[in-house]
């Protein structure tokens, strides 16, 4: 008699109550991890630029939530965050260095814990006139 295969256990994952909602908004380019902290005694603290970015990003996110009618879902819903970077010049930048501050400042507004966030950098290009970060945010279903 063949042994029954054990079911593969998944991470904690709730099915979204609002699976078809999508939130789109633009933000200024985030401060990179390299410019996020400064030394303060025995520790470190956020730079003024990082604190200002958090305020701006949270304000813009709140506006988008209100204007687009975004509804918060269950705690253990996973979210996809597609990111489109438009840099102001051709200087070499690591777009991945911008994720830490961005995800930390959106935590509590769009999702409960950035553990449940799947950030995906989709595109990086040049836009001298309007440098920005465009975000498309939506829940991931169990079958995706």
Predicted regions and their residues:
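Acidic, proline/glycine-enriched N-terminal capping motif
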Residues: 2-144
